[in-house]
């Protein structure tokens, strides 16, 4: 498990911790943002072209549009570097 610092400001406060758990056996990564009560699973085989759109749409249900876009970009960066 890795904990990354997002440090993204929202109207309700700052999003700080993003938890990443890489499951190499099942070929996927679990991503969780406890402050938003949000999580998702990203498969190694998932289409990288549609991933940003999927993450942003999911995050927008829990926060504003601009922070959702910033956070999605950071998550993609962290997941692809693992």
Curated annotation (Swiss-Prot):
This is Uncharacterized protein YueH. It comes from Bacillus subtilis (strain 168). The gene is yueH.
């Amino acid at each position: 498990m890795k904990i990354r610092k997002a440090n993204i400001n929202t109207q309700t406060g700052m999003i700080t911790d993003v938890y990443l758990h890489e499951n190499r056996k099942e070929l996927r990564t679990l991503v969780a943002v406890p402050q938003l009560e949000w999580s998702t699973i990203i498969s190694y085989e998932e289409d990288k072209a549609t991933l940003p759109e999927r993450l942003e749409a999911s995050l927008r249900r829990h926060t504003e549009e601009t922070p959702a876009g910033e956070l999605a970009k950071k998550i993609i960066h962290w997941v692809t570097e693992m």
